[in-house]
Amino acid sequence: MKPYQRQFIEFALSKQVLKFGEFTLKSGRKSPYFFNAGLFNTGRDLALLGRFYAEALVDSGIEFDLLFGPAYKGIPIATTTAVALAEHHDRDLPYCFNRKEAKTHGEGGNLVGSPLQGRVMLVDDVITAGTAIRESMEIIQAQGAQLAGVLISLDRQERGRGEISAIQEVERDYGCQVISIITLKELIAYLEEKPEMAEYLASVRAYREAYGI
């Protein structure tokens, strides 16, 4: 586990974005942990979040020309990641996001920010069913741009209804790499380091055995 990944887990725990216990997911599965990125909801939270996204992007080595944040949750993520790349990595890159509803006056259209072109890095909080990614791909392809990759905060590394995860489906369908700041693997490694959190380790491991990819 890299230092920024450990720091991100601690940041998520401190904001109660990441919780351990027993939770029922939308899929009906009982999960021993829950991640709600919507609780990163202050200026300082967003500034820090952008630094973690930027770190993961630089670490990945993937080449891209523009950041795209799908409405709605992806919008602040793309914005803060663009700021962090410029301030901390000397990479001043354009960013763009979409509107859910096309504007009929003024500048018009359903895209805001830089022109959507070149190699696009899509940033979002998580991938659950991959629906938002598919909708974004239609927008990206309509502009003649290419998807360079997808970056999310957490990869749960678990199967969907079939034998592979929603993330693996996205990688298969669009031929792109999906990267994340952390995965279930790092969460387990973190729990293994923390004796005071040992009570959660067995249930998280059991969950991985049942649903892991």
Curated annotation (Swiss-Prot):
Q: Where are the transmembrane segments?
A: none
Cofactors named for this entry: Mg(2+)
GO biological process terms, alphabetically, are: 'de novo' pyrimidine nucleobase biosynthetic process; 'de novo' UMP biosynthetic process; pyrimidine ribonucleoside biosynthetic process
Pfam family example for this protein? Pribosyltran
List, in alphabetical order, the Gene Ontology terms for molecular function in this entry.
Answer: magnesium ion binding; orotate phosphoribosyltransferase activity
Q: What's its catalytic activity?
A: orotidine 5'-phosphate + diphosphate = orotate + 5-phospho-alpha-D-ribose 1-diphosphate
UniProt cross-references to CDD domains, sorted A to Z: PRTases_typeI
Signal peptide positions on this chain: none
* Binding residues for orotate: 34-35, 128, 156
EC number of this enzyme: 2.4.2.10
Show the GO cellular component annotation of the record: cytoplasm
Decide whether keyword RNA-binding is in the record: no
Binding, 5-phospho-alpha-D-ribose 1-diphosphate? 26, 72-73, 99-100, 103, 105, 124-132
* Key words of the record: Glycosyltransferase, Magnesium, Pyrimidine biosynthesis, Transferase
- SUPFAM superfamilies linked: PRTase-like (SSF53271)
Q: List the disulfide bonds.
A: none
Q: Which pathway?
A: Pyrimidine metabolism; UMP biosynthesis via de novo pathway; UMP from orotate: step 1/2
- Cite the NCBIfam families for this sequence: pyrE (TIGR00336)
Quaternary assembly = Homodimer.
As for family, the record states: Belongs to the purine/pyrimidine phosphoribosyltransferase family. PyrE subfamily.
Per the entry, what this protein does is: Catalyzes the transfer of a ribosyl phosphate group from 5-phosphoribose 1-diphosphate to orotate, leading to the formation of orotidine monophosphate (OMP).
Q: What is this protein called?
A: Orotate phosphoribosyltransferase
